[in-house]
């Protein structure tokens, strides 16, 4: 069972934040869409409805694996799969970025964040500190003057990293924590 803390709503946007949480119903749809595209995910059995009286959430299958990065890099049980994980992650990201946003309905429940959105929001936050740093000023202005244009937007997990991947001796068994996924530049998942 995946629920919001306190059983309430987990979606929304906090003023001044760059990322948006699409909510648990959207997270369930993300996992279902990713699984249908060949991304390893738990099976989502049921998305809670308001009539259920249990708050927002969903029920999914239990998967066996390890998500703690320190254990993944040291566990003798995972020694054989470790050299193959980078390749598996590349395959998984390619599948995520190729998901048809319109056909899955994700375009209706996810926010779009462009590189320009990130640069402008970060620049505005920096300026609010009113402590000029010449190199940051130079870099910020350069980024503002060289924003990418004409990018093809895709589904972005936005937190694809050790700790959000469940690993077993067979490889990646699940991509976890979709709460900051959005539509944007897929390069966000590579940095």
What kind of region is each of these model predictions?
Residues 1-155:
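ATP-binding pocket architecture of kinase catalytic cores
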Residues 154-155, 161, 166-191:
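Active-site Asp-x-Gly
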């Amino acid at each position: 069972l995946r629920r919001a803390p306190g059983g309430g709503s987990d979606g929304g946007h906090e003023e001044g934040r760059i990322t948006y949480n699409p909510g648990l119903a959207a997270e369930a749809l993300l996992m279902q869409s990713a699984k249908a595209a060949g991304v390893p995910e738990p099976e989502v059995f049921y998305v809670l409805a308001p009539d259920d009286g249990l708050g927002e959430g969903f029920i999914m299958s239990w998967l066996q694996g390890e998500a703690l990065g320190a254990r993944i890099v040291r566990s003798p049980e995972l020694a054989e799969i470790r050299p193959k994980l980078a390749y598996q992650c590349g395959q998984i990201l390619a599948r995520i970025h190729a998901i048809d946003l319109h056909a899955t309905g994700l375009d209706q429940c996810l926010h779009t964040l462009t590189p320009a959105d990130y640069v402008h929001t970060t620049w505005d936050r920096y300026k609010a500190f009113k402590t000029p740093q010449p190199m940051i000023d130079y870099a910020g202005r350069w980024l503002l003057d060289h924003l990418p244009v004409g990018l093809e937007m895709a589904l972005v997990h936005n937190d694809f990293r050790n700790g959000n991947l469940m690993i077993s001796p067979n490889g990646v068994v699940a991509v976890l924590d979709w709460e900051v996924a959005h539509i944007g530049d897929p390069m966000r998942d590579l940095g």
